[in-house]
């Protein structure tokens, strides 16, 4: 198990080179490579349709390129939140249910719809892309406010910083203050949780899954 800084990988060639290096330096028999990536993923064709974090990967048949660089080994590709959903359905909190919704709170909000214990991608691959659910709309400015804008961990830190009148604050510090009964942070956290609960309510009534699982860095 190892980690590589995403900032050190800034091009398609570097990305392929990095994965190939890990593969070729492995001292184990590798039967396949599974890639978990942000963005709208066409898992069947091994392509990232939409990705903001790594624009150089957009529209590329990533599985084919990596396979060629790694002795033609089998390579699979899926959205990171949907990978979390598969894990929950397989050996996690959703394993006792046929249908589930997985919500991953992080830099944005990831999601996965589990239908009959399988990932449901939808007709246009947007099923589970709950980060972009609209929570408010300003007609005068034509500005849209999404669920990610108000209920991601990034949004929580921003809301806490504004309430505390500081330039910035990280999530760990937010919860340290909350655990120490800081009234300002507790109020921020209360409203943050309410914003999450409202959309979970909407998701429940939209799909009626057996369970909704919440994960991501915030769950630590």
Where are these regions (language model features)?
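A charged helix-plus-loop insertion that forms the helical arch/lid used to bind
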Residues: 47-59
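ATP-binding/phosphotransfer module of carbohydrate and carboxylate kinases, centering on a glycine-rich
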Residues: 1-32, 42-47, 63-75, 87-99, ...
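Short loop/edge segments at beta-strand edges and connector loops
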Residues: 77-81
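Short beta-strand-to-turn element immediately C-terminal to the catalytic PLP-Schiff-base lysine
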Residues: 87-88, 112-116, 120-122, 134-136
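Structural signature of FAD isoalloxazine-binding scaffolds in flavoprotein oxidoreductases
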Residues: 126-130
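Gly/Thr-rich phosphate-binding beta-strand-loop-beta motif of the actin/hexokinase/Hsp70
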Residues: 1, 102-119
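Residue-level structural signal for beta-strand termini and adjacent loop
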Residues: 3-5, 54, 125
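A cytosolic small-molecule/anion-sensing beta-strand core signal
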Residues: 31, 37, 115-116
């Amino acid at each position: 198990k190892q980690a590589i800084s995403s900032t050190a990988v800034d091009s398609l060639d570097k990305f392929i080179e990095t994965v190939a290096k890990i593969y070729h330096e492995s001292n184990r028999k590798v039967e396949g490579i599974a890639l978990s990536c942000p963005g709208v993923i066409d898992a069947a064709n091994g392509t990232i349709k939409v990705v903001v974090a790594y624009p150089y990967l957009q529209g590329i048949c990533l599985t084919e390129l990596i396979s060629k660089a790694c002795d033609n080994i089998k390579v699979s590709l899926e959205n990171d939140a949907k990978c979390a959903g598969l894990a929950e359905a397989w050996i996690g909190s959703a394993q006792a249910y046929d249908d589930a919704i997985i919500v991953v709170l992080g830099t944005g909000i990831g999601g996965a719809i589990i239908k009959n214990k399988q990932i449901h991608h939808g007709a246009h691959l947007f099923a589970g892309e709950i980060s972009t659910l609209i929570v408010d709309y300003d007609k005068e400015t034509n500005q849209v406010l999404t669920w990610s804008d108000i209920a991601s961990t990034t949004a929580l830190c921003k809301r806490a910083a504004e309430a505390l009148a500081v330039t910035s604050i990280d999530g760990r510090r937010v919860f340290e203050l909350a655990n120490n009964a800081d009234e300002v942070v507790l109020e921020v956290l209360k409203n943050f949780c309410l914003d999450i609960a409202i959309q979970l309510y909407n998701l429940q009534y939209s799909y009626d899954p057996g369970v909704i699982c919440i994960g991501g860095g915030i769950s630590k």
